[in-house]
Amino acid sequence: IVTPQEAKDIIQLQIADLNITEPKNLEEQALSLVGRDVYEKLIKGYTEKQWGRDCKDLPAFIIKRLPVRLTFDNNYFNALYQGIPMGGYTKMVENLLEGIEVRLNTDYLENKKELDALAKKVVYTGPIDAYFDYELGYLEYRSVRFETETLDKPNFQGNAAVNYTDKETPWTRIIEHKWFEFGKDENGEELPKTIISREYSSEWKPGEEPYYPVNNEKNAALYARYKEMAEKENIITGSVHAAIYEFVSSAFLKDF
């Protein structure tokens, strides 16, 4: 393959040969979008490593679309304007919280009565099953663990994020943080060292931080029951991964 059109033709041929009209699982959904070669080289191993499950056992709706570009554009998003806050998100949040009381290492559920009395409305961003003390059982989540190290070199991988799509490599990706701001400090000077973080995906266990929900029929049914309980308590679902049990940016609002 030497031209973008040749690559496009092969992908379309593979999709046509598979003839998957109604994908029953994630594997069939991916095959129907990008064909077998791209799926097996870039999607299958990474996805099974991320979710800890065979692609055939994951629902099709997890992959709504797979952006395929036959160019050197390696951005995932298509927005015309993209960026991150100067100094990073920590600095942005610090500025947002200026003048606001912040309590760290405080569990809302363990101090619920006291904290509820502080405001007319409380935004709860924890797991919905934890809110109800796991009365109906545990929802399943995936968790993420980071191993971070400082290297005595100016450049490790030359890019902010590199995904490892094979199943054998234990981490899903390596983040080299300096490249989010072009490898320079706040004065525009080159940084002589670099910090990297290896990201590992794992099954969530109580006491760990839940990162994203495992969307399958069993969990969907259990979440529906928790959601019904929340509605009876006049809890309005908003947009946080755990609170509304969806892989989105979310929040959970309780109206008193």
Predicted regions and their residues:
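Active-site/ligand-binding neighborhood in enzyme catalytic cores
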Residues: 2-121, 129-132
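Aromatic-acidic/polar surface patches that form glycan- and anion
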Residues: 19, 82-89, 163-164, 246-253
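Surface-exposed flexible segments
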Residues: 62-69, 136, 248-256
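A short, flexible beta-alpha/helix-coil linker loop
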Residues: 77, 203, 243-245
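Conserved beta-strand scaffold positions in the cores of enzyme catalytic domains, especially
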Residues: 102, 122, 195-197, 235-238
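Conserved beta-strand termini and adjacent loop/short-helix elements that scaffold enzyme active sites
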Residues: 105-107, 177, 239
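C-terminal catalytic lobe of FAD-dependent flavoproteins
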Residues: 209-256
